[in-house]
Amino acid sequence: MKVKPSVKKICDKCKVIRRHGRVMVICQNLRHKQRQG
């Protein structure tokens, strides 16, 4: 899980979602997991 000020899709399988008011990226590739904060 990377915590970044701005999250972006890295590949085609990345999805940008909102959980509990936080913007997150989830992906099949676990290296692409990101959270804004």
From Swiss-Prot:
The keyword Ribosomal protein is annotated on this UniProt entry = yes
Which keywords accompany this UniProt record? Answer: Ribonucleoprotein, Ribosomal protein
Molecular function in Gene Ontology: structural constituent of ribosome
**Is the Nuclease keyword given for this protein?**
no
Q: Name one Pfam family in it.
A: Ribosomal_L36
* BP-aspect Gene Ontology terms: translation
In terms of domain of life, where is this protein from?
Answer: Bacteria
Coiled-coil stretches are none
Q: Which GO terms describe its cellular component?
A: cytoplasm; ribonucleoprotein complex; ribosome
What family name appears in the similarity comment?
Answer: Belongs to the bacterial ribosomal protein bL36 family.
* Record-linked HAMAP family: Ribosomal_bL36
Q: What is this protein called?
A: Large ribosomal subunit protein bL36
Organism the protein comes from = Acidothermus cellulolyticus (strain ATCC 43068 / DSM 8971 / 11B)
